[in-house]
Amino acid sequence: MSLITTTAKKFILTFCLLCLATEVWAVRAKIRFLFPVSMESVTDGFENTKINTSEFVLSFLMPVSRNTQLDFGYSYFNARIEDADTASEAYSGVFRAHMLEIGAGYTGIELSRTISMLIEASTRFPVSGQAEVNGTPSSSEAESISGMGYFLGSGIAYGNIDLLLFYQQRDLTFDELTVLRDGVSKDVALHSKEYGISIGYTF
């Protein structure tokens, strides 16, 4: 029996890649917080859901030219979902995903001496996650995740701070996570589109 789980191996691999990136390139790190103001979501297996999400991103920026940089980082996504009060079989769920981010940013358009326009785009791949669903008449848990996410943002950069308007999309499936509806087992998956404001700090 292996002493290291598959999830632990994925975490170790991601950490090693991030450490390697900091050694090979003269990189800078960025912390980004996302604040959704509008969301469209569909959660397979749930009925007329209420959803609350939060997300935190840590990126390493690797310059490839004066105005272009690659983005290699980590995103932590958390969601809490509940069936509407009118649902005949009420469930609630918690979803957590650890995602690897690969993208690029461009700051070649100067608006003033100190302010530049910033355009960012990235793709996110889940490397691990946990989810649980509780309710009547059944409950389930899962730790295996698959899917993909996309991020696109445009805004301004001033010194070490940037402010973006963003759009992002996620499609996440937790294997073996199910709910029971009218005696039939249904898979649970999260599909969401968000518009919002992003604040980043580079150090």
Q: Which role fits each region the language model picked out?
A:
Residues 51-57, 97-101, 145-151, 192-196:
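Transmembrane beta-barrel architecture of outer-membrane proteins
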Residues 23-82, 200-202:
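Short glycine/proline- and aromatic-enriched beta-strand/turn motifs that initiate or cap beta-hairpins
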Residues 29-35, 58, 70-74, 102-104, ...:
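Membrane-embedded beta-strand positions of outer-membrane beta-barrel proteins
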